[in-house]
């Protein structure tokens, strides 16, 4: 296999206008890979460390140190390694960093090299990235979980839940699912406008109307689904990302939700009522990131009807996921490559989840680039679900468009996950 001969990093801008790391890896057969590293707004305390410069430049968010770490420390260490030995490349970087959370070199430095190496190796093997990583049997196209109303840390809308997503479960193909989602999205704009609300957008391309409650937001989307000519619960289902750590008061031990202070038990009842009244297939981070007992209880209560997804709760970390499996806390893993900081560790987390019947949802971050790696990963790892924001804004649509290409490449072998991706329809 071709060897790494050059690694170069640079500082670029993400979709929020903040700096991030881009890395290029060159092999001795002239194969090449490039990767841009995403960044989150609501970040879990257990995530791998994203290295920022501090100071005045870019309001402290510069990544020149991470870039320097790639160019001056990581590059010499991985030069000469075979690009198809992903685990060795990642191990060399992890050993070089030496910390528990990648705080010395920066997860944003390590991940950039890790992803760019995989892309270069795929190019060298003359394979699509999804085929290189997933092998000849990778053929399942994921359900796009489109975030069409943004709240929480992603917008100034006033609603506490961070993401209101639609899942086109009734589609026969990814192409049809994308069309359905786009049609609902455009109809939602007219519904919001007709109510005299703002059609401004949040970080992930969804609308950010000033609504007072979760139910009000869901009702707006339900109206848009109907207006688009689709049946709620048959063609289109709902999914939520509560990102509840963002409205949890650690000092008081309560959730400041919709104008009141609520206990974990109260929140469990809130979610039970929502699942009862709306066709919700997935709830992400319903409780704060260290409430193991609460997650276990919630999963026991409604886990047979709905997917309970650990994002900040698991942070794509195999060790935390293992604990969750043992405690029967949550039943699905949100997969964010930059939470753990290397491709090998991401693959380990996905495999651990799937081996224990936990579903996986591949995910973008609110600060994205035009990089489409996660689209390929969602197919390579047979996730069956992906969230990449609204069907608008090019950094979001880039991933969905890549999935269109993959579906076209697979031809008759392509299978759209559809309803089978969720426990509500596939218990």
From Swiss-Prot:
The keyword Acetylation does not apply. Its EC number is 4.2.1.11. It is an enzyme of class 4 (lyase). It holds the Pfam family Enolase_N. Mg(2+) binds at residues 241, 284, 311. The keyword Iron-sulfur does not apply. InterPro entries: Enolase, Enolase-like_C_sf, Enolase-like_N, Enolase_C, Enolase_CS, Enolase_N. Its main location: cytoplasm. Binds a second Mg(2+) ion via substrate during catalysis. It catalyses: (2R)-2-phosphoglycerate = phosphoenolpyruvate + H2O. (2R)-2-phosphoglycerate binds at residues 162, 336, 365-366, 387. Pathway: Carbohydrate degradation; glycolysis; pyruvate from D-glyceraldehyde 3-phosphate: step 4/5. It is found in: Cytoplasm; Secreted; Cell surface. Its cofactor is Mg(2+). One of its GO terms (biological process) is glycolytic process. CDD domains: enolase (cd03313). One of its GO terms (molecular function) is phosphopyruvate hydratase activity. Keywords: Cytoplasm, Glycolysis, Lyase, Magnesium, Metal-binding, Secreted. NCBIfam families: eno (TIGR01060). Belongs to the enolase family. This is Enolase. It comes from Corynebacterium kroppenstedtii (strain DSM 44385 / JCM 11950 / CIP 105744 / CCUG 35717).
């Amino acid at each position: 296999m071709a060897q790494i001969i050059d690694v170069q990093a640079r500082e670029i801008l993400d979709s929020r206008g903040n700096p991030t790391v881009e890395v290029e890896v060159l092999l001795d057969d002239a194969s090449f890979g490039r990767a841009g590293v995403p960044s989150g707004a609501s970040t879990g305390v257990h995530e791998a460390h994203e290295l920022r410069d501090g100071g005045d430049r870019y309001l402290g968010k510069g990544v020149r140190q991470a870039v320097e770490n790639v160019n001056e420390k990581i590059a010499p260490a991985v030069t000469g390694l075979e690009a198809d030995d992903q685990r060795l490349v990642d191990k060399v970087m992890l050993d070089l960093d030496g910390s528990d959370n990648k705080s010395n070199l920066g997860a944003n430095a390590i991940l950039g090299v890790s992803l760019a190496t995989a892309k270069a190796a795929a190019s060298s093997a003359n394979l699509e990235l999804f085929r290189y990583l997933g092998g000849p049997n990778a053929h399942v196209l994921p359900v796009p979980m489109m975030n069409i109303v943004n709240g929480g840390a992603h917008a100034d809308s006033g609603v506490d839940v961070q993401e209101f997503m639609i899942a086109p479960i009734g589609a026969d193909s990814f192409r049809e699912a994308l069309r359905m989602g786009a049609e609902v999205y455009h109809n939602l704009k007219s519904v919001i406008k007709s109510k005299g609300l703002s059609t401004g957008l949040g970080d992930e391309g969804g609308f950010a109307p000033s609504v007072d409650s979760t139910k009000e937001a869901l009702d707006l989307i339900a109206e848009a689904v109907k207006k688009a000519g689709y049946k709620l619960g048959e063609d289109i289902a709902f999914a939520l990302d509560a990102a509840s750590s963002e409205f949890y008061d650690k000092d008081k031990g309560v959730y400041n939700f919709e104008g009141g202070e609520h206990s974990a038990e109260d929140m469990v009842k809130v979610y039970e009522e929502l699942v009862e009244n709306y066709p919700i297939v997935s709830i992400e981070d319903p409780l704060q990131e260290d409430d193991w007992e609460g997650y276990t209880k919630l999963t026991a209560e409604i886990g047979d009807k709905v997917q309970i997804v650990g994002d900040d709760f698991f942070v794509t970390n195999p060790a935390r996921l293992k604990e969750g499996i043992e405690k029967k806390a949550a039943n699905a893993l949100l997969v964010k490559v930059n939470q753990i900081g290397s491709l090998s560790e991401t693959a380990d987390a996905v495999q651990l989840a799937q081996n224990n019947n936990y579903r996986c949802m591949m995910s973008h971050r609110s600060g994205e680039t035009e990089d489409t790696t996660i689209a390929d990963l969602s197919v390579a790892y047979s996730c069956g679900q992906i969230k990449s924001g609204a069907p608008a804004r090019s950094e979001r649509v880039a991933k969905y468009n890549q999935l269109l290409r993959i579906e076209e490449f697979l031809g008759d072998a392509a299978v759209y996950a559809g309803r089978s991706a969720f426990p509500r329809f596939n218990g």
